[in-house]
Amino acid sequence: IKKFKLSNYFKNVAIRPGKPILFAKFKNKEKSFFGLPGNPISSAACFRFFVYPYLLNILGVKSEKSFKARLKNKFEKKKNLTRFIKSKLITTKSGNLYIEVLTGQESFRIKSFVKSNVWSLFKAGKSTFKKNEIIDCYIPLGWDKNHFL
């Protein structure tokens, strides 16, 4: 950071997957810098939830909104972490949306990422999420017709 004269805005945040992440700006310049983690799912999550919204913002594109779905199965996590969870979105015949938390949530596990079709957001401050609880969800990049890659 010192060598390249960066102003450190944040380094490491309390999320999983996604450690470590860095966002900085070059001092006296209008250039930004993201440092993404090495594990594939951590990198994908950080790009999706930090880099992509940043790019939309500097381009003046309206930020996206999450959509809501009910949790199909109970989920537990550490209370102090926000978790971006690889999930499967399911639509019932009556049109209700449910998410199923997939097994294999470790940041090096790609199979569950390939099987997923939605990111579920489990916010910090709570450790247990009950069946049928309403959860914020985000479509993976490339699936949203209102935004571009």
Language model: regions and residue ranges:
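Flexible glycine/proline-rich
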Residues: K2-L149
